[in-house]
Amino acid sequence: MSATSASVTRHDWSLAEVKALFEQPFNDLLFQAQTVHRQHFDPNRVQVSTLLSIKTGACPEDCKYCPQSGHYNTGLDKEKLMEVQKVLEAAAEAKAIGSTRFCMGAAWKHPSAKDMPYVLKMVEGVKAMGLETCMTLGKLDQEQTRALAAAGLDYYNHNLDTSPEFYGNIITTRTYAERLETLSYVREAGMKICSGGILGMGESLDDRAGLLIQLANLPEHPESVPINMLVKVKGTPLAEEQDVDPFDFIRMLAVARIMMPKSHVRLSAGREQMNEQMQALAFFAGANSIFYGEKLLTTANPQADKDMQLFARLGIKPEERQEHADEVHQAAIEQALIEQRDSKLFYNAAV
């Protein structure tokens, strides 16, 4: 497959095709990925986000990789939902150090009706600062997605984690179909999708290919595709898994770039374990988004000044924020605003 033909947006990838991409000689794969990348992005710009945990620990889900799960003893301090003002202060700090997108994550199976008004205030406040907004709150219903869209949420993160075939080995408290359903509700409400997965959980090459097939064969590609490397946390069932081969991780980024040519491919969790050379190779493979700052939910992340020093050495600059939604998403958001006028989600939270 030529680099030119691979840059065409497709939604009909087969397992054989994707495995053939993975099995190319390393240099050929990276050349193809970089060629595709340059057709759609400035190769020397990287989108910069900051992620804040707005509610930490005691999650009822049993994701085997996650230190926030209430099923495992990881020594993580449990915290209630943050006050809106503290979230806004953190967002202001993120903007000051160069982030253009502020992502808020809560350890929930799904947000409760009691918490939704506070969550919506967070979105409105961060949006008012001129930052793009992103949240990950677990499973959503249609009413909740419409409320978030009406509040100004730009992106919703809901990872598929792995292939449908391997998924049951990692989590039993939420089905794959439920994850896909949430993504469909997010899209219907006019928000953009952030969805990816994790390497290093014991999955096979077929599973890695299967994850990318699920993402690329959605009706619309996710605008953001985070590729995580497992951060092994003592107390979780995956704490003793073998390390991911760095070249295998780079291959995953490159294949994601080829299959989803217009998506931002995010170098996400696990970056603390990557040296500068591996990160540079990741950018060459087509990764063009990072989380920036000291913490990534509950695990360490390279410090902001180290990121900027690496950017300077590589001649990379942070991507500027897009100020306007495209017409399709804007129309859907306006419809959500109309439908939201009579929403039952707005109530007196003091009651």
Curated annotation (Swiss-Prot):
<comment type="similarity">
    <text>Belongs to the radical SAM superfamily. Biotin synthase family.</text>
</comment>
<feature type="binding site">
    <location>
        <position position="266"/>
    </location>
    <ligand>
        <name>[2Fe-2S] cluster</name>
    </ligand>
</feature>
<comment type="pathway">
    <text>Cofactor biosynthesis; biotin biosynthesis; biotin from 7,8-diaminononanoate: step 2/2.</text>
</comment>
<keyword id="KW-0479">Metal-binding</keyword>
<keyword id="KW-0808">Transferase</keyword>
<dbReference type="GO" id="GO:0051539">
    <property type="term" value="F:4 iron, 4 sulfur cluster binding"/>
</dbReference>
<dbReference type="InterPro" id="IPR013785">
    <property type="entry name" value="Aldolase_TIM"/>
</dbReference>
<dbReference type="InterPro" id="IPR002684">
    <property type="entry name" value="Biotin_synth/BioAB"/>
</dbReference>
<dbReference type="GO" id="GO:0009102">
    <property type="term" value="P:biotin biosynthetic process"/>
</dbReference>
<keyword id="KW-0001">2Fe-2S</keyword>
<dbReference type="InterPro" id="IPR007197">
    <property type="entry name" value="rSAM"/>
</dbReference>
<keyword id="KW-0093">Biotin biosynthesis</keyword>
<protein>
    <recommendedName>
        <fullName>Biotin synthase</fullName>
        <ecNumber>2.8.1.6</ecNumber>
    </recommendedName>
</protein>
<feature type="binding site">
    <location>
        <position position="63"/>
    </location>
    <ligand>
        <name>[4Fe-4S] cluster</name>
    </ligand>
</feature>
<dbReference type="InterPro" id="IPR010722">
    <property type="entry name" value="BATS_dom"/>
</dbReference>
<feature type="domain" description="Radical SAM core">
    <location>
        <begin position="44"/>
        <end position="262"/>
    </location>
</feature>
<keyword id="KW-0949">S-adenosyl-L-methionine</keyword>
<feature type="binding site">
    <location>
        <position position="66"/>
    </location>
    <ligand>
        <name>[4Fe-4S] cluster</name>
    </ligand>
</feature>
<keyword id="KW-0004">4Fe-4S</keyword>
<dbReference type="Pfam" id="PF04055">
    <property type="entry name" value="Radical_SAM"/>
</dbReference>
<comment type="subunit">
    <text>Homodimer.</text>
</comment>
<feature type="binding site">
    <location>
        <position position="103"/>
    </location>
    <ligand>
        <name>[2Fe-2S] cluster</name>
    </ligand>
</feature>
<feature type="binding site">
    <location>
        <position position="59"/>
    </location>
    <ligand>
        <name>[4Fe-4S] cluster</name>
    </ligand>
</feature>
<dbReference type="GO" id="GO:0004076">
    <property type="term" value="F:biotin synthase activity"/>
</dbReference>
<dbReference type="InterPro" id="IPR024177">
    <property type="entry name" value="Biotin_synthase"/>
</dbReference>
<keyword id="KW-0408">Iron</keyword>
<comment type="function">
    <text>Catalyzes the conversion of dethiobiotin (DTB) to biotin by the insertion of a sulfur atom into dethiobiotin via a radical-based mechanism.</text>
</comment>
<dbReference type="InterPro" id="IPR006638">
    <property type="entry name" value="Elp3/MiaA/NifB-like_rSAM"/>
</dbReference>
<dbReference type="Pfam" id="PF06968">
    <property type="entry name" value="BATS"/>
</dbReference>
<dbReference type="GO" id="GO:0051537">
    <property type="term" value="F:2 iron, 2 sulfur cluster binding"/>
</dbReference>
<dbReference type="GO" id="GO:0005506">
    <property type="term" value="F:iron ion binding"/>
</dbReference>
<keyword id="KW-0411">Iron-sulfur</keyword>
<feature type="binding site">
    <location>
        <position position="134"/>
    </location>
    <ligand>
        <name>[2Fe-2S] cluster</name>
    </ligand>
</feature>
<feature type="binding site">
    <location>
        <position position="194"/>
    </location>
    <ligand>
        <name>[2Fe-2S] cluster</name>
    </ligand>
</feature>
